[in-house]
């Protein structure tokens, strides 16, 4: 994607040199949290016909176009970024009060992506009104926003974001967190949370654990997510007359990973900063410390974003997993856990982090070879099961074909989950907006695997997978579940992968 000129007032010395894509110099209307929005106008006017913002805002903010979120504000810290927050406004839009909160977070080293809930709900409404509209996976929208902005502003590495929402935004970010696979977000911070919210007529997918009941006002009343693994902090004013503090306490008490920060002198408007700002900074810092603390890595591979899932099995095999472009999250975590439960230790290479910068097939193969040599020795194993999911599946055949002969001989199986027709060796915005596909073709690389046992797994209705079209006899094929996520049938995936490696023959 070509760079576009013009980027409104990024603070000098920031790590981000230029934004890619469409930029806007529109500024947000200045108001207070909880204050009523200005009179409704056309969507274009909402983005561009605002009052000027304070000078403090122009010292930090740039605006870019971000799909369903419309124009988003991006705030850059003075030094190297330490974390990323995606901040969704209340019904009043991206105004002075939430802008001040964003500035407070940049002082903690955060890049803050500020989104106007009015733009987002308008997009949801449009999607919901289409004939045969499916349920909406709002977690994917927030994840894509984080990916896009971090890539466009030139972040040197990807940071798993914290979700923050005020008022109506507080409810929406809770829903996104409950939907999301583990590892997608660092957690969420909800300021002024109510369980009921109008999602513009959209039905929400359950995802990893979101449940709700529609009420007579056509709102969705969200339920506590008992299985929520990522931390959720309800930041609640005890004088809030819009969202009951007692109701929030009762809601959070049913979620094991939830905390409530009680603010005795605060109402729904969060108007007096001294009554909540210290606690706000502290709550955010707790979420970022939890996710950003680097795990200790073996010296031989300490430059690689690896994740170990040990196991106590006495077998002679381990698994190496190349993740999808979402990183170490969701299916990748669940599959690794299932393999480990069967006695097969697993190490993952986080594709989102590793391919954040461009790689070559040879470079990737060299790094995977380093991982293999390390774990063959460290774990005392003789064979390896190579597994790739989605982005990682596209890359994996290129890697195997470039491994040294001694390592290639120890590959028990190559397992391609959701492989596409083309591979990419750099995470790009096109991968998230569905316009990728210009990379090197995967079919010739799969064919070149020769006598190496290959299992190609696809979901029912998965139109992008090359598995069904591969020549019969050369590659074993298996259809599991539905779609690109295999209906969450992780146990079946693990069972099929292990069975194939131990008895390498075609699977139908």
For the regions a protein language model found, what residue spans apply to each?
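Catalytic histidine neighborhood in serine/cysteine hydrolases
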Residues: 113, 255-271, 347, 472-487
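Primarily recognizes the serine-hydrolase "nucleophile elbow" in alpha/beta-hydrolase
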Residues: 152-153, 157-218, 383-440, 445
